[in-house]
């Protein structure tokens, strides 16, 4: 379906899709605690999604920075190279009111506008009219509060429907920001959902952030499913942090200060309230504790 020389490889694309949406998430700068890509993977799994297209990496990646990986195929001694992947998956869940295409990828190093052009080509061929991009950022927020979802949208009603807090951020952007702009210029409705992740637990998976993003997408689709797996992960995450607070009163005081700051008022967009005394050391202790606990329990 695509030219042999094109990095966009469309393997199959049914012509009878029901008002499809595109959900996109990228590992890297846009993906604090891997929250966005974990949400995308969860949706793919829950919808039994199958791959329908991919963007080959050769033109867009510096392999000295993001290296391919060697994997041994199960049950054999055959080694296989796994390249950085940007893949499109089509939902096969028949109870969904409309089809969903999920792009699970990695932020490329090169030719971002060309890269986004290939994404829009898939959207055009599939007759997608709405794009939801997922991201996650580190913020001065406590884990004891509901996850705040910030974002931007080309459609005010769409933003209100997804309950996003508007952002007036200005500054460096990632592939998500570039894709949002490309969609806008291409005439597609786009909303970008960003989970605010507590910066003191940035190096471990955050089930609360994953759950918040998944719920927003499912709410948009008006589709219910059992989220017990994610909810159980969030409960265990809280339990682990409660152990830290019980053992380390200085960490508890740090989080209480974050709670007080949040209770007074949200910090002005783009401003940081600044580091609390000794915060860097506390962050290292929290993350070390969580990593050790997950190794002991066999969690990823």
What are these regions (language model features)?
Residues 26-30, 103-112, 162-170, 200-204:
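Flexible, glycine/proline-enriched loop segments at strand-loop-helix junctions
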Residues 2-105:
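N-terminal short beta-loop-beta anion/metal-coordinating cradle
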Residues 140-220, 224:
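Catalytic cores of processing enzymes, dominated by hydrolases/peptidases
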Residues 98, 104-157, 179:
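Internal, conserved structured core segments that host functional sites
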Residues 201-300:
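A conserved C-terminal secondary-structure "cap"
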Residues 31-38, 110, 114, 170, ...:
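Conserved active-site and cofactor/substrate-binding residues in soluble primary-metabolism enzymes
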